[in-house]
């Protein structure tokens, strides 16, 4: 799970229930009818696992939310990386407008990390306990937030221009090819992973039953390659590791060759 979801709710004093996300379900958690939740965080394509929900899986979450009077907070920060016939938005699912809020960011789509610009979609028909959620959110924003700076707004507007969309598609295609290169190497090595398509992330199972930090140390010391230990994303990440395609082509190819060499020697 993306750590911000956890930490922000801990600071708010909320009780947190973790959905089961593991190899058995392809790291695409599904609702548990025995669990009652008021707010549900979903991220698809997922950070860190790279898995992306299909329409049937998202429908299961929407049905659960409607049945339990819950609200889904849907993080679609990586929707631009989807290449297969998968939903890019929770609102592609019937009934979602009555139970979901969608958040998206230009951080990964257009390289806005640090510049900070994104958007939130709240259907005007979304209500809970007699309160209109859109009206409440609008009041909150008008009180606590003065908006993104003008230069950043201009840059964000350029993202949606014809030329901006052309450049973004080229940029995303570049990272998608990096992800394919990494995934191809893992296929060659026979290592289980999720992601590698529809996402810039590759979530791999550490070889030889190694722990996440043990594998981190191996790659750092033997290959001079750095990734993210899965344990940093919660207990379901133990024994897994995240690689990213957000690098240049030359470094990606070099890193893959180094990883292949280390893991080939490890299996001897």
Model-derived features: positions:
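Helix C-cap/helix->beta junction micro-motif
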Residues: 12, 67-68, 189, 223, ...
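Active-site phosphate-binding strand-loop segment of PLP-dependent enzymes
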Residues: 14-91
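Residue-level recognition of strand-loop junctions within catalytic nucleotide-signaling folds
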Residues: 123-124, 161, 205-207, 246-248
